[in-house]
Amino acid sequence: DKDMRHEAEIAVRLGRPIQIYPIMETALRHASGLSVDAHMEHISKLWAGFSDVAASNPNAWIREAKSAEEIRTISDSKRPVSFPYPKLMNSNNNVDQAAALILVSEEKAKALGIAKDKWIYPWAGTDAQDHYYFSNRDNFHSSPAIRLAGGKCLELTGSTPDNIDMIDVYSCFPVAVQIACRELG
């Protein structure tokens, strides 16, 4: 197992998500030319959309929809955690984001009684990784890995973002969602 932090990052104790993502968020805000207030309004609206979805999910950690204003407003119960993120823009420590995709042959799908109109066929898959060490990245507001992997997947499938009905992008922190959306077009 290789430590994901460079020795310089270890020396200054940099490496936890609550340290890295706020740095990226601030870099993205700067690269976007937004004021702190305008950026907070933007990311709290983004998070309010996720909150709306979570409110209808019986397995969600927080099942009460929060408005953008509630999300960005600091209070006794919604303390600042790591600028620019108040409590409701932070991940919860007991969240399981595990996912699985089980692929079977048509023969197996038939044997399992899965209706043919429920079958899906993967067209392509790609993988990429941004620089292993955070401090060695070219910048903190983009992801060449997402751009390259997403672009290659579109190329392999002959698709464009315009002819895709839905792309599900989620992360524990707003910046990762914003960067992914920008990189995927």
Q: How does the language model describe each region?
A:
Residues 1-95, 99-101, 107-108, 115-185:
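Conserved "HGTGT" condensation-loop signature of ketosynthase/thiolase-family condensing enzymes
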